[in-house]
Amino acid sequence: MNLTYLRSFYTTVKCNSISKAAKQLHLTQPGVSMQIQKLENDINFKLLNRSNTGVSLTSAGEIIFEFAESMLSIEDNLQKN
């Protein structure tokens, strides 16, 4: 599982928006969208429901979001040390 894609997914959920996540990550909106799609393809599950009002997690997305939170926290701690 690609941590860059996982970070894009995590940030999108936290921002409730792909475009807001893209700004925060200094990426383009299509780039973030593509990373999330690749993550979904890698694990064979849809993670997000996309709408004009934002994004919401699917049941698989809820599980992966918790996993992402743990993995990204570990990665951040490793980079600090």
What are these regions (language model features)?
Residues Y10-H26:
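Short helix-boundary/capping micro-motifs
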Residues D42-I43, I64-N81:
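Alpha-helical linker/hinge and terminal dimerization helices associated
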Residues K23-Q24, N41, E62:
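Alpha-helical residues within the helix-turn-helix
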Residues S17-I18, I36, R50:
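Helix-turn-helix DNA-binding elements, focusing on the entry/boundary residues of the two helices
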Residues E40-L57:
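A short LG(V/I)-centered, amphipathic sequence patch enriched
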Residues N2-Y5, Q29, G61:
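The N-cap/first-turn positions of alpha helices
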Residues L6-V13, T58, F65:
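Hydrophobic residues on short alpha-helical segments
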